[in-house]
Amino acid sequence: MKEVYLDNSATTMAYRSVGELVQKVMCEDYGNPSSMHNKGVEAEKYIKEAKETFARLWKVQEKEVYFTSGGTESDNMALIGAARANKRAGNHLITSSIEHPAIINTMRFLEEEEGFRVT
């Protein structure tokens, strides 16, 4: 029987070429991209190339591209940033009860700690 995987919004199989590159980076080019030694310089090249690629695809500037550790951190950054940036326009935020916990918890934070009204 052929497997049909329907949870791709949570985890999707990587292309083989992506998996091979990730393995190479993690096993060979694993330097700290913030360091000035050779491994760090090589690691920084991967980040720079990725930023250039994403910026070109999304038609934005490289300085507008941020990499995070995952979806929850991205949700937090986007929601908190947008809420704070637009607070002068009003402090009412609207969400739904079926949102991912990362969204619900961030909305709760904005309500309890930053004074937003959430419905």
Language-model segments: which ranges?
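Pyridoxal 5′-phosphate
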Residues: 1-119
